[in-house]
Amino acid sequence: MPAYFQRPENALKRANEFLEVGKKQPALDVLYDVMKSKKHRTWQKIHEPIMLKYLELCVDLRKSHLAKEGLYQYKNICQQVNIKSLEDVVRAYLKLAEEKTEAAKEESQQMVLDIEDLDNIQTPESVLLSAVSGEDTQDRTDRLLLTPWVKFLWESYRQCLDLLRNNSRVERLYHDIAQQAFKFCLQYTRKAEFRKLCDNLRMHLSQIQRHHNQSTAINLNNPESQSMHLETRLVQLDSAISMELWQEAFKAVEDIHGLFSLSKKPPKPQLMANYYNKVSTVFWKSGNALFHASTLHRLYHLSREMRKNLTQDEMQRMSTRVLLATLSIPITPERTDIARLLDMDGIIVEKQRRLATLLGLQAPPTRIGLINDMVRFNVLQYVVPEVKDLYNWLEVEFNPLKLCERVTKVLNWVREQPEKEPELQQYVPQLQNNTILRLLQQVAQIYQSIEFSRLTSLVPFVDAFQLERAIVDAARHCDLQVRIDHTSRTLSFGSDLNYATREDAPIGPHLQSMPSEQIRNQLTAMSSVLAKALEVIKPAHILQEKEEQHQLAVTAYIKNSRKEHQRILARRQTIEERKERLESLNIQREKEELEQREAELQKVRKAEEERLRQEAKEREKERILQEHEQIKKKTVRERLEQIKKTELGAKAFKDIDIEDLEELDPDFIMAKQVEQLEKEKKELQERLKNQEKKIDYFERAKRLEEIPLIKSAYEEQRVKDMDLWEQQEEERITTMQLEREKALEHKNRMSRMLEDRDLFVMRLKAARQSVYEEKLKQFEERLAEERHNRLEERKRQRKEERKITYYREKEEEEQRRAEEQMLKEREERERAERAKREEELREYQERVKKLEEVERKKRQRELEIEERERRREEERRLGEDPLSRKDSRWGDRDSEGTWRKGPEADSEWRRGPPEKEWRRETRDDERPHRRDEDRLRRLGGDDEERESSLRPDDDRIPRRGLDDDRGPRRGPDEDRFSRRGTDDDRPSWRNADDDRPPRRIGDDDRGSWRHTDDDRPPRRGLDDDRPPRRGLDDERGSWRTAEEDRGPRRGMDDDRGPRRGGADDERSSWRNADDDRGPRRGMDDDRGPRRGLDDDRGPWRNAAEDRISRRGADDDRGPWRNMDDDRVPRRGDDARPGPWRPFVKPGGWREKEKAREESWGPPRESRPPEEREWDRDKEKDRDNQDREENDKDLERDRDRERDGDREDRFRRPRDEGGWRRGPAEESSSWRDSSRRDDRDRDDRRRDRDDRRDLRDLRDRRDLRDDRDRRGPPLRSEREEASSWRRTDDRKDDRTEERDPPRRVPPPTLSRERERERDREGEKEKASWRAEKDRESLRRTKNETDEDGWTTVRR
């Protein structure tokens, strides 16, 4: 829509303006823009006149497509608002089209009969015919006037029907337009358009049935809709009958019957009567007299039943028509010889069944059936007397000589009733044919031969030719046995005795049978005669006996009938079951066969599809290649043709054919083309230069010649312009003078009216002054009142605003005070928390100082122990005889002032097997180094010494040097289970009071590898206090159990320590440098050996190789944990600084598992201050208890050493040929060896305690130095120091477990510094022994039961 039409009214006004000046097309365009506009889609009252004007213009201009589009747009606009407006517009549109068509028809003389299809007016034949024959002015006028308007009217009807279809709101309008369209077709005899209209209506009906779910869909179950559709179809049927379009009429009948079937209620009797009347006409016109008569029968019965006011004349007329229609049904069957030869019986039967369905009959009617119905319902009594006897003459009586004469009277009476009974005239020919046939049948039964002239005299209403044709048809179709002899002009009947009549032969009045029938039925007649004779011959008593026998049989049957009936039923049931079983088997077999066939077919289909796909691919490839080749050749050919069209190309390729050049390279041709283009370009430039010179010279000469001409023309034009200006100036002055004179005249004339005007104005003012003053006074009063009201309103509003402002300020003040109070409380809480953190820091520093003091004292004691161990090792090395060395050591030990005597303390249960010398030396020598390594591993190391260990010039203590005088790393008597052999007689490592169940294999009663006094949870990595990775009770058993609940191996955020034992493992490994996972087997892995029980884990290299390749030559550190380290495993930090642990762990393994489960709680920051305070108190109590237990353990250790020295003198020296060689003489299991001798465990336990003491000494010394360098810990370390767990782990364990482990090696010590520490340790140990002698000794005793469990008795 144009931008200047903001309202539809403006568009309508604009269109009317165009129409006033005779411009219909612009007016139509303006209104079209309005209808297409999306801005005005809501219906308004102005839309209807706009639409009417729009349709009027479309009719005037014959723009049917624009009218259709406008109607659809208007339907969308007003369908939901005002559907009545749409109906009015459509009716007005059709009325305009009809008026225009009628006007054109009056002006034209043409009847539009010669045009078959309005959609295709000019056919090639009509154009040629008009060119050949020529047309006058009237014909051309008719073609230009009437035909286009008729076509426009037809298109209008069709468009409106399409617009209104399947819309329940305009259903009445739809049927009215359809009926108008039928009248149009009938008026203008438009047969083609009638067929199209019927097809459209049929399509609309199918769409109604298909799209019944739409909101505006038509419900065919509605009686009103059904009546409207039936009415329209009856009009269609009537129009088809009037136009003699019987095929369309029959389709209309089928449509009407379909509508009847959709209806749940029976249609109205008037409608059915009209329907039967129309259908009877259709059947008669189609030549189907049988169904025509049947339809009249239905109409007759309907009228008798439903019509209450049926008169006697109407009843008589209907009965007469029914009688004549029934008797007019051909006696001969409808099937022809061609139908018999083509075996079209099925088609005929199906057709008759369909026709019977249209009449509501269950089966197709027959002539005999209709005659019987007519007699049964007593139709003959209502027939007129003149026709009443016709039934008896044709169907009952046998009188061939008078038959035609009687029938002739009836036919004459029918012919005399054209005005009263016009519909009876159509039955006369059929009645004549039936009369001739009945005459021939009766004559054949009487005469054997008859002359043709005699027969002609018996049939007076036909000539000889028609009679002969009737005779031939009767012989062909009615099984009439007749032969015509043209020589004698006679007819002979029944001459063929072998002739057999058909079953459908017509039946009529019968006198006697034909000779052929008598011969054919001779056996049947003989049988009937013999049966009668037999009845006569048989006497009565025989019949009586038969009757008695019959009664006996009946009695026996009645007696056994129930059983027999049950037997028959059972047999029937069995048969049915067997049939069902067989059917199921057959169905199953067929199903399997079908599935198998389908599977085979599927395989074949897939193979075929694959083959076709491959072939298609290959064909596609070949096609693409061919297309490429063709495109290439085409490109080459085009280039060559382009080149040859030029002069240079023609010269270059004049001797070469294009077909030969197609084999050349396109690049070569392109190069030729480029070369040729360059030459042409040069030639063109030269020609342009020459032409430029010519044009330049020519233009210069031309301009020189035209200069004087231009000057002369300028002078002439200047003179003309001057004359014109002077003339116009004179005219202007004259015009102004005339205007001034006229103005003066007007002034003089009007000046006489000035006084009258003033007087009128004065009177008017005087008259209206009082009115003005009164209105002014009223205005001032209203103004004062309004001013007062507004002032009051303003005062009230100000009061409300002040009140609202006061309450808002008061609320803001309260909110501000609450915020200040909350801020103050938060500051107080922060201040209290800050003071609490400072108090915790101070307490932590005090606790650290106490721990350092305790460590200093313990270090002095351990130095004494180390000094004593060193002296004992030197004495052991100096002595040659093992027995003398042990005696001297025992004497030295006695001289130290020990209070225990050897013989008194030496009991059988404490004595163990003689310990081998190399094992004692190994454990004593490697104890200090392992303690240092354990302590430094736990610390993780962040001082300068640990950082320096990463450098190549590593000065750490070598783990195993070449000059190491210790024994072999591992012997067959190694005390770890994973390294034991089957003959190991050592006792278990389990603590005496350890009540934990055995860990893994068999009856293994060993505890963990840790010290007996170590009650802390096990470690894995550095200070890992996590729960065990395997089962709850399995401490480092098999590498993974079935109930393993471990998480992922290692995550990015895993803060656990390295699995190889801490940060001091700098060995070259096959793992990545950042991979902190523990070794597969070794270090702290206490799992059993993967090899056999007799395998004591010898070196995987040769026995003589002592790990020199991985350890430095000066490495005197302890042995590797994975092979020959007999230290306790690092599953708990047993050598950390601090007081000694109690010897007996309260709670056992159950308490430990409970502590581990509860260790999965929240972090330490979530604990309340009361729990942290309780932790600090508990820490102090544990420190005091550790100090007491430390003194007791040292005393117990001294006791064991004295006992061991006493037993060493009786110990046999061991052959140390191979450090991995197992004992050959020991063959018992580890359980038997533990039972045989428990004393060896005491010796090994004492050695382990000594080595652990040395490690603790070095670790605490390094920890002190490390703390001095690091200073006080941060808050995160302090908070994590006191763990929220219930176990007795130390703060160092948790702190190091929280901190991510760092791969920094521990600080190393030189050999001189190590020796100084050994001497200090010996001195501290000696002083500690003197102090320990004053304390009471806790006596222990190891008892082993039958199952191998070891109990420690105090």
Curated annotation (Swiss-Prot):
A Pfam short name: PCI
Annotated Gene Ontology cellular component terms: cytosol; eukaryotic 43S preinitiation complex; eukaryotic 48S preinitiation complex; eukaryotic translation initiation factor 3 complex; eukaryotic translation initiation factor 3 complex, eIF3e; eukaryotic translation initiation factor 3 complex, eIF3m; microtubule; multi-eIF complex
Location of region: Disordered: 809-844, 866-1249, 1262-1354
Subcellular location as annotated: Cytoplasm
Coiled coil: 82-120
GO molecular function, one term: mRNA binding
Source taxon at top rank: Eukaryota
N6-acetyllysine: residues carrying this PTM: 68
Chain positions with Phosphoserine modification: 492, 584, 895, 949, 1038, 1159, 1233, 1310, 1336
Modified how: Phosphorylated. Phosphorylation is enhanced upon serum stimulation.
Keyword Magnesium: no
PCI domain ranges (all copies): 315-498
Any Gene Ontology biological process: formation of cytoplasmic translation initiation complex
Mapped Sequence repeat ranges: 924-931, 932-941, 942-951, 953-962, 963-972, 973-982, 983-992, 993-1002, 1003-1012, 1013-1022, 1023-1032, 1033-1042, 1043-1052, 1053-1062, 1064-1073, 1074-1083, 1084-1093, 1094-1103, 1104-1113, 1114-1123, 1124-1133, 1134-1143
Keywords: Acetylation, Coiled coil, Cytoplasm, Initiation factor, Phosphoprotein, Protein biosynthesis, Repeat, RNA-binding
Residue span of region 22 X 10 AA approximate tandem repeats of [DA]-[DE]-[ED]-R-[PLIGFSV]-[RPS]-[RW]-[RL]-[GNIHT]-[DGLPTAM]: 924-1143
Reported function: RNA-binding component of the eukaryotic translation initiation factor 3 (eIF-3) complex, which is required for several steps in the initiation of protein synthesis. The eIF-3 complex associates with the 40S ribosome and facilitates the recruitment of eIF-1, eIF-1A, eIF-2:GTP:methionyl-tRNAi and eIF-5 to form the 43S pre-initiation complex (43S PIC). The eIF-3 complex stimulates mRNA recruitment to the 43S PIC and scanning of the mRNA for AUG recognition.
Subunit structure comment from the entry: Component of the eukaryotic translation initiation factor 3 (eIF-3) complex, which is composed of 13 subunits: EIF3A, EIF3B, EIF3C, EIF3D, EIF3E, EIF3F, EIF3G, EIF3H, EIF3I, EIF3J, EIF3K, EIF3L and EIF3M. The eIF-3 complex appears to include 3 stable modules: module A is composed of EIF3A, EIF3B, EIF3G and EIF3I; module B is composed of EIF3F, EIF3H, and EIF3M; and module C is composed of EIF3C, EIF3D, EIF3E, EIF3L and EIF3K. EIF3C of module C binds EIF3B of module A and EIF3H of module B, thereby linking the three modules. EIF3J is a labile subunit that binds to the eIF-3 complex via EIF3B.
Assigned protein family: Belongs to the eIF-3 subunit A family.
Protein name: Eukaryotic translation initiation factor 3 subunit A
Organism: Rattus norvegicus (Rat)
The encoding gene: Eif3a
